[in-house]
């Protein structure tokens, strides 16, 4: 019998000094995961000569209780329960040398309601492990008992729609451009023009905080003046994502309180502030009836490459637990990374009460969200009115469609850019509701609407043929991944 991956127990274990991870009990090919286990799927690339099962056991060990040698203090713990267990290893289809490694963790290993603690175990150490050329966390499954220790989004999609009194169609937004350099007064003018033209939201970008050209307080004052004026003139509830990201939590709370005092309904933070800060701001938003918008700034440094890092679907799961109301999830048709099925998988993580296994969309596990509120996905980055049929078909109603350059760059002005997007959306939703095939008839529907809307006509003439047809880096490993054609 081959014993190289068989656990060594008893006194022989503690005489051994250094054992293989599989021999220390971190591999169990017969293990059946429990409903209460936290499950993780890693993509691993072992060094030449390293047994994939041993590599998988090492991942389980180094993300739970192991160190490089046997330690007698294991005997002071319930080590059989505390050890994570790699229980399945499969070759990655079409990628020699890479393996999918499934690992189960007993729920007792994790602090309740703490993304910081969860990530310290799952990704804290294993990604630097020498026997692995590369490792990537592809997906996770959280038991209901663990999900219930989190409060989730402070507002959720249903309550947000009730506050806006907007139902049955996507929300519209735009990012103020240029990102940097505008004075507070000019910034507020851009916000007013976009909202007056028909958008629901305008937003700060990820790197606009409090720079010499525009102090944060000036921005907040001019922006909220614009929001209130546009709301009064249109009769619609409007908002602007005020970015409160700062160098300390104390300063972030100070900015959040000022935004609230001005009547803002929403604040924004960047992913780079960290999970503890995100959970803290989420709790503040919950206590103060504020919507929390999350910009995923920095995620591409570790989510884009298929062989090493963390899939964005995992980040989306962590952020739903941590408690954000909006999350940038990609566009599939815009300028940023993401093929259609993969991006749809991110949206499913945000919006569904229960995720089923869907390998085409990168979902390897079922996930019961235990009535945790839903996150509103945001599609932003290189999109324009000419793609409205694709965006509506891909993502449905519960999404914020943000046209930054596609609003601010309109040849007839900002307000005209907003109007073009609003008319394009209304025309496409109407056509869909009438039973028309918007995938096929989309361009025709837009051109018909443009006959009665000069701003839309100008938008289609300016950007109608603009596409970003590049091969996605992060794609499904199980099915062909089609591109979206205009």
Curated annotation (Swiss-Prot):
The keyword Lyase applies. One of its GO terms (molecular function) is monooxygenase activity. Substrate binds at residues 125, 175, 179, 296, 328, 380. The modification N6-carboxylysine is found at residue 203. Its cofactor is Mg(2+). Pfam families: RuBisCO_large (PF00016), RuBisCO_large_N (PF02788). Disulfide bonds: none annotated. It catalyses: 2 (2R)-3-phosphoglycerate + 2 H(+) = D-ribulose 1,5-bisphosphate + CO2 + H2O; D-ribulose 1,5-bisphosphate + O2 = 2-phosphoglycolate + (2R)-3-phosphoglycerate + 2 H(+). The active site is at residues 177, 295. One of its GO terms (biological process) is reductive pentose-phosphate cycle. Mg(2+) binds at residues 203, 205-206. The basic functional RuBisCO is composed of a large chain homodimer in a 'head-to-tail' conformation. In form I RuBisCO this homodimer is arranged in a barrel-like tetramer with the small subunits forming a tetrameric 'cap' on each end of the 'barrel'. NCBIfam families: PRK04208.1. Belongs to the RuBisCO large chain family. Type I subfamily. Heterohexadecamer of 8 large chains and 8 small chains. This is Ribulose bisphosphate carboxylase large chain 1.
